[in-house]
Amino acid sequence: MKRPALILICLLLQACSATTKELGNSLWDSLFGTPGVQLTDDDIQNMPYASQYMQLNGGPQLFVVLAFAEDGQQKWVTQDQATLVTQHGRLVKTLLGGDNLIEVNNLAADPLIKPAQIVDGASWTRTMGWTEYQQVRYATARSVFKWDGTDTVKVGSDETPVRVLDEEVSTDQARWHNRYWIDSEGQIRQSEQYLGADYFPVKTTLIKAAKQ
């Protein structure tokens, strides 16, 4: 089902209580205002829609909302209307101003479909396409997963205990690590992934998950 989050913000600003209107205005300013946003506990508590923080290629932290959820994929929109698409927490496509992740195949076999069931040594192979300095690249990427201890993820004043999942990825030309912070229910609370082969890091921190 498609859910246009930006329209939802507009509806929130037109109706509901003064408190909700103030929240809507605050989030609107965060979405289209200065990067590096940090929402307050009240903002997070009253959040009416799915959202997360993202950091692109070492840039400032952005507040990102879920624009659409369809066919098992979630499409997140940045404050400058760039789009990042995830599936089961994995970045699978981007529409940014510069370089992009073009595609990832074999997603039906991705162990992240059920992260809590991953065992050390689990593996996955796929083809990925991306642009690097505007040049199109394709490679076969091979992943090996292992658990790497425990941690906590903090959003506002709330701390969630998590297990850390390490994904070692290799192609014929490069090797890198993606990492995922996963709670007791199998929800990916935080991640560090790469748009290409050891190129263009993307960090995510979940604020509010989309409804299943």
UniProtKB/Swiss-Prot annotation:
Record key words, sorted: Cell membrane, Lipoprotein, Membrane, Palmitate, Signal
Lipidation (N-palmitoyl cysteine): C16
One of the Pfam families matching this protein, by short name: YjbF
Gene Ontology annotations for the cellular component aspect, listed alphabetically: plasma membrane
Subcellular location: Cell membrane
Lipid-anchored residues (S-diacylglycerol cysteine): C16
PROSITE patterns (alphabetical): PROKAR_LIPOPROTEIN
Principal subcellular localization: membrane
Keyword S-adenosyl-L-methionine: no
Residues annotated as signal peptide: 1-15
Source organism, top-level taxon: Bacteria
Keyword Transferase among record annotations: no
Membrane topology type: Lipid-anchor
Family to which the UniProt record says this protein belongs: To E.coli YmcC.
Protein name: Uncharacterized lipoprotein YjbF
Source organism: Escherichia coli (strain K12)
